[in-house]
């Protein structure tokens, strides 16, 4: 923020037309920090990234200068029938908000100036009717509101694109949400096509973002290569009040009913003190459960109207979600429970408290969620984080401190997605025939494709030309023609294929589950199926099943009565802990362990935690005793940011578990766990079950492992140089590869979601995908397969960070130690071991299992001469 210059009110008023300045003075009295910095920059035609919290006025910061410039044109009779500004957002709901938010000031300005020029605002999305689109051709809006996908289609439209040739400003809202996905790559490349093939001149790019980091990279994503930009850093202009709350004094010995009672008592106490409360959970299932329990409580205790409690998540119909949003705006609701669907800046009116149930897994998400409270620049964003266990308590305490200290984790921006590249090449050919070398230069100005290799580009051109297929199939799969090996033309039919199949969001599929004798069991979401491996146990309709495999859109299982689930049904929905946040949690563990080692007293350590992390003494004691138990149990080996501890635990079912305690973010751990499992499986010629959490991962094998098997030697066999290849081999036969291949094939127009205007059958697409996948395995360097592997390793996992960790291990910056074998798991391993239990047993029983594991730890320490219960009471 120190590099951001904030202009005075008078300086900005002097830049505006008198009647615009008068209207603003009457309505707002003063400019907000993002407005003070951004409006003058936009008036000076700078590319600008504005990063500030919800309710800080960044939307008006973007539009006020633009409206003023359009009024100037109108006052001079120079306002023509063409589009001057385009607003692009990831959500259609945001687009509807934006239209309302622009029409309101236009109507108010008309009261200040009766001769106000008629500035038109219009929406063009997939919901826009052909009639409305036709009207736009005759009388286009001066400000066009759209989505990335509709923008891509608009610039390839021969007629409508002619109305866009003089666009002066493009605003990208919620840019942080777009930048970390393939939708962002699509938009980034489309903006380059727009600049070079439609406007043929530069336009002002304005990015609006919530709290995000690093700002420099997001700004480069916005403007592309070799363009100047300015950053308005107003991320921390709103005061934030964050508190982490433990629902009970003792998270270990309290029963599940006591913890549950404590959670809802805390929620009710907070809700009573506030007008409107927004509660975030981490899964849709939890959202429904919390909303249901709150309704029951409200009914029993008569504290507020049952109808004033609603749930809001992506599985609900659009009409239901819109109804909830409308009730929120009108102030009818007391409580709304959501998963991730209300994180973005949809206008939901007045919220004065946000409650987070459990960790949001990253600092940026914590700030974004809490930022929904106090929807005004001078309001305090008030957030309460309620934890559910000791791991959650440690994690949330560290995340809250990082948020207060303004340390935000980095965004991940996908690089060189070849399926998106396929769409961009087809769209470029539809705008006009283009020289392949010229298009390559244009594409490399996009941040996402700035280091696109000539070989990958040629590979995708060959694929789109049908060169990978025999003569009989060439015409079926080709989407372009390249004349004289130079000029790219669209193939007949490509325009309709592009219009009906472009975009990057895959269709969500429900997969039928059947037994080996074809008895129907139920349905699973595709994102859950993709994390399954043969032998995995999961729960469906209250019964346990073993996953055998899949065929097309069917999952084949067999009953697994009495077996412990290895994958909880909600796990695919769980957000992964961010890398930087994980490192900070590891650092915190290390610092407490060092204090214990130095002999710092219990009370001093607890006092230090309370003061530095702003939590109460009971929560501090829970954290301290948790780390103390691990320290005493493992003889001082507390896994941290610079220590990976491999714990060898032999369980009661005859399974040897190699538990890797490692805090480096779940995406990196996902990659490492698959590499290690693959090598162990190859070396021991046995099946290896993998379980990954945010705090580490476990490799489980049958007990007949050679007694002297050196698990630590894996770090010599898996290196920064070979880990990419090993993980690639590991994922080649997974469900994830099958599912992601279909998504990439659909994005690459190899499998069509819509053909000749009609929706194609999903089951047929699944089968086609399987057939193609088998055939393509034989083709070397096939771009769709190459992209599938890249997406899994770089976007879903974090292979780059996995390499970084292995480098640090090789240089001894990160140490690796081994503990065990033992038949009692260490305190830190309990959550990893019990990962699947939440589906097969009641939560009450799961907590009882945790208590029993804890009792075994206490007994183990007692045998070592340490009475941990006395340690507690001495505090």
Curated annotation (Swiss-Prot):
The record marks 505 as: Wedges between bases of the loading strand. InterPro entries: ATP-dep_Helicase (IPR052511), DEAD/DEAH_assoc (IPR013701), DEAD/DEAH_box_helicase_dom (IPR011545), Helicase_ATP-bd (IPR014001), Helicase_C-like (IPR001650), Lhr-like_ATP-dep_RNA_helic_prd (IPR017170), Lhr_WH_dom (IPR045628), P-loop_NTPase (IPR027417). Residues 39-230 form the Helicase ATP-binding domain. Residues 507-875 are annotated as: Domain 4. It holds the Pfam family DEAD. One of its GO terms (molecular function) is catalytic activity, acting on DNA. SMART domains: DEXDc (SM00487), HELICc (SM00490). A motif (DEIH box) lies at residues 173-176. It is an enzyme of class 5 (isomerase). It catalyses: Couples ATP hydrolysis with the unwinding of duplex DNA by translocating in the 3'-5' direction; ATP + H2O = ADP + phosphate + H(+). Residues 420-506 are annotated as: WH domain. Its EC number is 5.6.2.4. DNA topoisomerase 3 (topA) inhibits helicase activity on Holliday junctions (HJ) but has no effect on ATPase activity. The keyword tRNA processing does not apply. It comes from the Archaea. Keywords: ATP-binding, DNA damage, DNA repair, DNA-binding, Helicase, Hydrolase, Isomerase, Nucleotide-binding. PANTHER family: ATP-DEPENDENT HELICASE LHR-RELATED-RELATED, LARGE HELICASE-RELATED PROTEIN. Monomer and homodimer. The monomeric form has helicase, ATPase and strand annealing activities, while the dimeric form only has ATPAse and strand annealing activities. Interacts with DNA topoisomerase 3 (topA). DNA helicase that translocates in a 3'-5' direction on single-stranded (ss)DNA, probably involved in DNA repair. Unwinds DNA in a 3'-5' direction, unwinding is ATP-dependent, acts preferentially on fork and 3'-tailed DNA; bubble and blunt-ended double-stranded (ds)DNA are not substrates. Has winding and unwinding activity, unwinds Holliday junction (HJ) DNA in the presence of ATP, the main product is forked DNA, single-stranded binding protein (SSB) does not stimulate activity. Belongs to the Lhr helicase family. Lhr-Core subfamily. Composed of 2 helicase domains, a winged-helix (WH) domain, and Lhr-specific domain 4. This is ATP-dependent helicase Lhr-Core. It comes from Saccharolobus solfataricus (strain ATCC 35092 / DSM 1617 / JCM 11322 / P2) (Sulfolobus solfataricus). The lineage of its organism: Archaea, Thermoproteota, Thermoprotei, Sulfolobales, Sulfolobaceae.
């Amino acid at each position: 923020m120190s590099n951001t210059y904030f202009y005075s009110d008078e300086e900005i008023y002097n830049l505006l037309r008198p009647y615009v300045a008068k209207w603003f003075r009457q309505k707002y009295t003063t400019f907000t920090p993002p407005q003070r910095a951004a409006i003058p920059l936009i008036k000076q035609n700078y590319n600008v990234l504005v990063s500030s919290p919800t309710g800080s006025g960044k939307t008006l910061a973007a539009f006020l200068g633009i409206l003023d410039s359009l009024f100037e044109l109108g006052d001079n009779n120079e306002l023509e029938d063409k589009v001057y500004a385009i607003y692009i957002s990831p959500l259609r709901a945001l687009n509807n908000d934006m239209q309302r938010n622009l029409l309101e000031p236009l109507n108010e300005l008309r009261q200040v100036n009766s001769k106000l020029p008629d500035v038109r605002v219009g929406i063009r999305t997939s919901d826009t009717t052909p009639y409305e689109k036709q009207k736009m051709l005759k009388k286009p809006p001066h400000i066009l509101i759209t989505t990335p996908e509709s923008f891509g289609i608009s610039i390839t439209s021969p007629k409508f694109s002619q109305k866009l040739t003089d666009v002066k400003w493009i605003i990208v809202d919620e840019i942080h949400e777009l930048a970390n996905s393939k939708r962002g790559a699509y938009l980034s490349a489309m903006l380059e096509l727009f600049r070079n093939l439609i406007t043929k001149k530069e336009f002002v790019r304005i990015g609006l973002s919530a709290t995000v980091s690093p700002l420099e990279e997001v700004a480069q994503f916005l403007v592309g290569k070799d363009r100047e930009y300015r950053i308005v850093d107003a991320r921390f202009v709103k005061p934030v009040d964050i508190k982490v709350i433990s629902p009970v004094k003792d998270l270990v010995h309290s029963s599940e009913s006591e913890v549950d009672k404590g959670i809802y008592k805390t929620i009710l106490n907070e809700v009573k003190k506030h007008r409107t409360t927004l509660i975030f959970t981490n899964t849709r299932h939890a959202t429904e459960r919390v909303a249901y329990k709150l309704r029951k409580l409200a009914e029993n205790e008569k504290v507020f109207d049952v109808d004033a409690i609603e749930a809001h998540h992506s599985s609900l119909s659009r009409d239901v979600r819109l109804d909830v949003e409308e009730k929120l705006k009108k102030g009818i609701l007391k409580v709304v429970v959501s998963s991730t669907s209300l994180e973005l800046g949809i206008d939901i009116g007045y919220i004065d408290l946000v409650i987070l149930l459990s960790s949001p897994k990253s600092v940026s998400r914590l700030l974004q969620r809490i930022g929904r409270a106090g929807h005004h620049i001078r309001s305090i964003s008030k957030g309460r984080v309620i934890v559910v266990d000791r791991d959650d308590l440690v994690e949330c305490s560290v995340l809250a401190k990082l948020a207060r200290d303004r340390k935000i984790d980095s965004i991940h921006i996908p690089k060189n997605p070849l399926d998106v590249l396929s769409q961009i090449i087809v769209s470029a050919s539809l705008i006009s025939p283009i020289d392949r070398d010229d298009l390559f230069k244009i594409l490399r100005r996009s941040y996402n494709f700035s280091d696109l290799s000539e070989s990958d580009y040629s590979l995708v051109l060959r694929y789109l030309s049908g060169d990978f297929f025999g003569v009989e199939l060439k015409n079926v799969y080709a989407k372009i023609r390249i004349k004289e090996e130079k000029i790219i033309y669209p193939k007949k039919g490509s325009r309709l294929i592009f219009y009906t199949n472009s975009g990057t969001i895959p269709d969500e599929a429900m997969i039928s589950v059947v037994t080996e004798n074809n008895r129907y069991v139920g349905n699973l979401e595709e994102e859950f199926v993709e994390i399954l491996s043969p032998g995995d146990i999961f729960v469906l309709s209250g019964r346990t099943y073993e996953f055998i495999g899949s065929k097309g859109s069917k999952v084949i299982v067999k009953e697994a009565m009495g077996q412990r689930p290895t994958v909880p049904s909600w796990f695919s929905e769980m957000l992964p802990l961010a890398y930087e946040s994980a490192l900070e949690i590891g650092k915190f563990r290390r610092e407490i362990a060092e204090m214990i080692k130095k002999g710092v007293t219990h009370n001093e350590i607890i006092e230090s935690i309370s003061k530095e992390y702003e939590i109460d003494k009971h929560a501090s004691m829970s954290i301290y005793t948790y780390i103390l138990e691990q320290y005493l149990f493992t003889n001082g080996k507390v896994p941290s940011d610079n220590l990976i501890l491999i714990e060898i635990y032999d369980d009661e079912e005859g399974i040897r578990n190699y538990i890797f305690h490692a805090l480096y973010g779940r995406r990196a751990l996902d990659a490492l766990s698959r590499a290690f499992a693959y090598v162990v499986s190859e070396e021991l010629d046995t099946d290896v079950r993998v379980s990954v959490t945010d705090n580490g991962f476990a490799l489980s094998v049958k007990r007949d492992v050679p007694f002297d098997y050196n698990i630590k030697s894996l770090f010599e066999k898996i290196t920064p140089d070979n880990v990419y290849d090993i993980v690639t081999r590991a994922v080649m036969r997974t469900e994830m590869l099958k599912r992601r291949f279909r998504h990439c094939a659909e994005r690459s127009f190899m499998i069509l979601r819509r053909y000749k205007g009609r929706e194609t059958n999903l089951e047929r697409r699944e089968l086609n995908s399987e057939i193609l996948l088998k055939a393509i395995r034989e083709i070397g360097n096939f771009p769709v397969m190459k992209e599938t592997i890249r997406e899994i390793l770089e976007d879903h996992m974090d292979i780059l960070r996995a390499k970084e960790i292995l480098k640090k291990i090789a240089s001894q910056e990160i140490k690796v130690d081994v503990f065990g074998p033992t038949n009692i798991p260490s305190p830190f391993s309990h959550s990893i071991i019990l990962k699947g239990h939440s589906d097969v047993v009641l939560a009450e029983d799961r907590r009882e299992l945790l208590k029993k594991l804890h009792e075994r730890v206490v007994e183990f320490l007692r045998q070592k001469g340490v009475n941990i219960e006395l340690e507690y009471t001495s505090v």
